[in-house]
Regions:
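Conserved GNAT-fold acetyl-CoA-binding loop/helix
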Residues: 33-56
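Conserved N-terminal entry element of GNAT/NAT acetyltransferase domains
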Residues: 1-20, 160-181
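A short helix-loop-beta-strand connector motif used in the catalytic cores of GNAT acetyltransferases and
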Residues: 55-68, 77
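Conserved GNAT acetyl-CoA-binding A-motif
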Residues: 116-128
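Conserved acetyl-CoA-binding loop-helix of GNAT-fold acetyltransferases
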Residues: 101-114, 139
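Conserved beta-strand in the GNAT
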Residues: 68, 74-82, 89-92
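Conserved active-site alpha-helix within GNAT-family acetyltransferase domains
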Residues: 106, 129-146
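A short, internal acetyl-CoA/4′-phosphopantetheine-binding micro-motif in the GNAT/acyltransferase core
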Residues: 92-101, 127-128
Length: 181
């Protein structure tokens, strides 16, 4: 993945995440999600969130894409996705406040939606109900197909894939991936 000349000109660069980035990942996750964890999950308890996010970080190291976003050499965000045989999932976009709405969001969403069309695989993601990034996902064509107590479940390109189960709708797709045969 290569950044646009515009983003490079603004001082942005990308690097693959490695084991040494775990603390930075937890810091950025705290900056981006603490208010939602406080709102929906009885508060950000540091010890518990460190365990959860360290585990998440190590799983993400195995994803198809897990990169850090740098501004003049300083890590200011991270993004990830994981391509599976029948979908693109584990979507994550974490940006600190100073770099939000500077074009990184559009770059990342443009990249994964183009990939989805190219490989004919739907994208699935979860977004906190009160997170305003939901509107950006909608702008890029994501649709809410369900919800939990805390999240909207969104999809992109689900209607235009080679998924043989697609005719029966998203519920059957979700059942197929969640129920082991």
């Amino acid at each position: 993945m290569v950044l646009s000349e515009d983003l490079i000109g603004k001082g942005f660069s990308l690097q693959n995440v490695d084991e040494q980035d775990v603390e930075k990942y937890i810091d950025i996750k705290r900056i981006c999600h603490k208010k939602y964890v406080d709102e929906y999950n009885d508060g950000w308890i540091e010890d518990i969130q460190t365990i959860i996010n360290t585990d998440s970080f190590h799983r993400m190291l195995k994803y198809s894409c897990f990169q850090k976003i740098l501004l003049y050499g300083t890590t200011v965000g991270l993004f990830a996705y994981n391509e599976h045989p029948d979908k693109i999932g584990e979507i994550s976009l974490l940006l600190t406040e100073p770099v939000r709405k500077k074009g990184i969001e559009a770059f990342y969403l443009g990249h994964i939606t183009a990939l989805s069309r190219q490989v004919s695989k739907p994208i699935f993601l979860n977004v906190y109900k009160t997170d305003p990034v939901r509107d950006l996902y909608k702008h890029f064509g994501f649709k809410i197909y369900d919800q939990s107590r805390t999240h909207y479940l969104m999809s992109f390109n689900q209607d235009h894939t080679n998924d043989i189960y697609n005719a029966n709708g998203i519920r059957n797709y979700m059942n197929r991936i969640l129920i082991k045969e």
